[in-house]
Amino acid sequence: MLALAAALIGASTLAVTAASAKQEKTINIAYFAPLANSYVQGELAGIAAVLKTNPNVKLTKVDTGFDATKQYNSVQDAITQKKFQGFIVLPLDSVGLVPAVNQAIKAGIKVVNADTPLGLRQDTVLPQVPGETGTVFDPWTLRGVWGAQLVIKACQGLSPCKVGWMSSVAALPAEKAYHDTVMKMLAKHSNIQVVAEVDGAAYTVQGGQKISQDLLTAHPDLNVLVAVGDQPAAGAVLSIDGAGLTGKVRLIGGCPSRISKPLIKSGKEWGSWACFPADEGALALQFLLNGIDGKLKKPVGASATVVALRKRKLSPLITKDNIDKYPMQYSGS
């Protein structure tokens, strides 16, 4: 893990030169993502900061929702327009999107994927598609290690420790990698029992509230509740409060936002793992511009969170004891 972090930091060093680069020719970039998602809006805030120093770069935002087929078709449509020099994609189907990206690369378009991997492997930030310019995301296997560490800490002193699991979109390859990594680590602890798993939080407060209500009704004796995503964790806080279980159920989210910060500080959300979506968006665009400028000699990859944590000398595990040390880079709404 330390070797991976060191490699990621080394890769990020190459990217910092792009933001100051001034281009005379207009560069058109397309960004493919579920635009209503607040994490995506955090990424776009980081991209906007880079755009301010590169006024010749024009960004077109393409809303794909959480529809992998729509995303695939949107990438193909953008290729046929023959106006874009670069794509930033947030892959909804890590493997299924590869043929469309191959078409883009063949057409001379530089491509960077962010937030989730592009290719079969979920455990590396190194680009997997030949000809791709770069990748910027936190491997969901790494996030899974952090998530498991939080559950293990929350379960200390409890035997049995009954755990409930709330997926957001369980079919997403990245989310499956997160789930499987956590479960593999928890299986090594005899006191931890995963008693229920539900799906459908959809990375929203409303989705998290609904399915957590159902879960708590069926299992009111839970000790720990894991929400995949920050927004559903905020919804689960409402359900836990409504059931009179505040202080009895330890809630673990992921990637805290401005909404969840006060929840973590108050103890209503027990813990979360760190993320830096604005840094991720900025780094993705910086990699892409370096690729378009011809400054990259080979594909590059990095985790913006690993880079930020090393720079700030922070732990990836966030609780009420240390949350004030972390910037919240998206709204969470």
Q: Residues of each region from the PLM?
A:
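Short, low-complexity disordered leader/linker segments with a strong preference
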Residues: M1-N28, K52-T53, N102-A107, K325, ...
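Hinge/cleft segment of the Venus flytrap/periplasmic-binding protein
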Residues: K25-I27, D123, M166, A170, ...
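Flexible loop/hinge segments that line or gate small-molecule binding clefts
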Residues: A100-L142, K162, S257-K265, E269
